[in-house]
Amino acid sequence: MKNVNDSFVSLGHWPFAGSFGFNTDILATNPINLSVVLGVLIFFGKGVLNDLLDNRKQRILSTIRNSEELRGGAIEQLEKAWARLRKVEMEADEFRVNGYSEIEREKMNLIIATNENLERLENYKNETIHFEQQRAINQVRQRVFQQALQGALGTLKSCLNSELHLRTISDNIGTLGDMNMKEITD
């Protein structure tokens, strides 16, 4: 009981406030003031807190949606990049195959052209050899003919004397005369 009296006595020691107000000193407040403050905070703070949480939730959802859209766009770009890469690889393989076949075709064309050139050169060589052989044969024939002619002329000059010469001429004139007579009579 003494405690109860002391609490009333202690009320007498406190100075009275000149007006109604809130005591901001938490240690000096009583449970009624605390419950009023908590009630006001809960009543008004609930809406603010709900608004803050809703805004935060909307920002998080918006960020997630944006992230999903960016992820979807990135996946789409990645798929396009893979498709382009496959296409470029196929084109590179095609160019490589076509390049190799083109190289083989050019190689075969070059071999064929080289063989044709070799054949032409071989034919030209053979023609040149044949021509040189014919020329050499003709030169030998001319020399043999000239030597034979000179030998025959030398033999004729050594064998012919003026009497033989006159007799051959008269025989030839006689033969020509006989031929002329036959032609006239015929």
Curated annotation (Swiss-Prot):
Keyword Transport: yes
Chief location: plastid
GO molecular function: proton-transporting ATP synthase activity, rotational mechanism
Matches recorded under CDD domains: ATP-synt_Fo_b
Parts of the chain that traverse the membrane: 27-49
Pfam families: ATP-synt_B
Keywords linked to the UniProt accession: ATP synthesis, CF(0), Chloroplast, Hydrogen ion transport, Ion transport, Membrane, Plastid, Thylakoid, Transmembrane, Transmembrane helix, Transport
Topology term for the membrane: Single-pass membrane protein
GO cellular component: chloroplast thylakoid membrane; proton-transporting ATP synthase complex
Keyword Magnesium attributed: no
Domain of life: Eukaryota
Cellular compartment(s): Plastid, Chloroplast thylakoid membrane
Function: F(1)F(0) ATP synthase produces ATP from ADP in the presence of a proton or sodium gradient. F-type ATPases consist of two structural domains, F(1) containing the extramembraneous catalytic core and F(0) containing the membrane proton channel, linked together by a central stalk and a peripheral stalk. During catalysis, ATP synthesis in the catalytic domain of F(1) is coupled via a rotary mechanism of the central stalk subunits to proton translocation. Component of the F(0) channel, it forms part of the peripheral stalk, linking F(1) to F(0).
Note: In plastids the F-type ATPase is also known as CF(1)CF(0).
Family: Belongs to the ATPase B chain family.
Quaternary structure (record): F-type ATPases have 2 components, F(1) - the catalytic core - and F(0) - the membrane proton channel. F(1) has five subunits: alpha(3), beta(3), gamma(1), delta(1), epsilon(1). F(0) has four main subunits: a(1), b(1), b'(1) and c(10-14). The alpha and beta chains form an alternating ring which encloses part of the gamma chain. F(1) is attached to F(0) by a central stalk formed by the gamma and epsilon chains, while a peripheral stalk is formed by the delta, b and b' chains.
Protein name: ATP synthase subunit b, chloroplastic
Organism: Illicium oligandrum
